[in-house]
Swiss-Prot record:
UniProt cross-references to PANTHER family, sorted A to Z: 40S RIBOSOMAL PROTEIN S15A
Function: One of the primary rRNA binding proteins, it binds directly to 16S rRNA central domain where it helps coordinate assembly of the platform of the 30S subunit.
Family as reported in the entry's similarity comment: Belongs to the universal ribosomal protein uS8 family.
GO MF terms held by the record: rRNA binding; structural constituent of ribosome
Keyword tags: Ribonucleoprotein, Ribosomal protein, RNA-binding, rRNA-binding
Keyword Hydrolase found: no
NCBIfam families registered for this protein in UniProt: PRK00136.1
Protein name as catalogued: Small ribosomal subunit protein uS8
Length: 130
């Protein structure tokens, strides 16, 4: 069976892994998934990520906890294959009043909503993380 939305699958694996208090989660790797993992690490939502280059590349994400509680409270897919969501720089959402981040795909690559606003760019809103 083919996977219809690999990004939603990635976010679900992270959500389920933290609900089960797993140390890490692994999934098939792709450039966009690695870029999302890089952004999550830069924002402090995950500890680390690595790509194991076996016959099929595997992305391993090390989850982060604070005092036994998952750092990621909510992680939600916004734009999906059946309904793409694009926002201009003025329309980019502030997740939880600025406490969370929206990951945005722009012409300059993947970045947070704050960075996109600073660069005066809009794009496709991939997901919300808080």
């Amino acid at each position: 069976m083919s996977m219809q939305d690999p990004i939603a699958d990635m976010l679900t694996r992270i959500r389920n892994g933290q609900a089960a208090n797993k140390v890490s989660v692994s999934m098939p790797s792709a450039k966009l998934k690695v870029a999302i993992a890089k952004t999550l690490k830069e924002e402090g939502y995950i500890t680390d990520y690595a790509v194991a280059d076996e016959t099929k590349p595997v992305l391993e994400i090390t989850l982060k906890y604070f005092q036994g509680q998952p750092v990621v409270e909510t992680i939600q897919r916004v734009s999906r294959p059946g309904l793409r969501i694009y926002k201009s720089k003025d329309e980019l959402p502030k997740v939880m009043g600025g406490l969370g981040v929206a990951i945005v795909s722009t012409s300059k690559g993947l970045m947070t909503d704050r960075t996109a606003r600073q660069n005066g760019m809009g794009g496709e809103v991939i997901c919300y993380v808080a």
